[in-house]
From Swiss-Prot:
GO BP: rRNA processing
Role according to the record: Involved in nucleolar integrity and required for processing of the pre-rRNA for the 60S ribosome subunit.
Coiled coil region boundaries: 40-101
Name recorded for this polypeptide: rRNA-processing protein cgrA
Keyword Nucleotide-binding in annotation: no
Homology family: Belongs to the CGR1 family.
A cellular-component GO term for this protein: nucleolus
Main location: nucleus
Compartments it resides in: Nucleus, Nucleolus
Pfam families tied to this protein: Cgr1
Extent of Basic residues compositional bias: 94-114
The entry's keywords: Coiled coil, Nucleus, Ribosome biogenesis, rRNA processing
Stretches with biased composition (Basic and acidic residues): 39-93
Length: 114
């Protein structure tokens, strides 16, 4: 007796729909949490996002530092030009040696107070 029961891969009949519209697909229950990612995937995505933000922060800080260095360079250049003009004005009124002496004294005082 080697007879097997024939099995077919036919979908079982669901029965008639209540409203009679059997040509429509039957609706499935709405489960919004079923498509969510696993905890490990969320952690990995969060780590990637934090790494990107950290990199962006570093780039912003680097750009800001360059900008401040440029501003400081301009300020130093202006101060040096101003000081040079001031000494030239003093040289018009006074002797050259006295101007040089005042220059040295101001430089000493600047170093002491800085």
């Amino acid at each position: 007796m080697s007879s097997a029961i024939p099995t077919s891969s036919v979908n079982p009949v669901k029965g008639m729909r209540k409203n009679g519209k059997n040509w429509h697909d039957s609706k499935k229950p709405f489960r919004p949490t079923s498509g969510l990612t696993s905890y490990e995937k969320r952690l990995e995505a969060r780590k990637r996002q934090e790494a990107v933000k950290e990199h962006e922060r570093e780039l912003r800080e680097e750009k800001e530092a360059e900008r401040k260095a440029q501003i400081q360079k301009i300020k130093d250049r202006r101060a040096a030009k101003e000081e040079k003009e001031r000494y030239e004005k003093m040289a018009e009124k006074m002797h050259r040696k006295r101007v040089e002496r005042l220059k040295r004294r101001e430089k000493r005082n600047k170093l002491l107070h800085s």
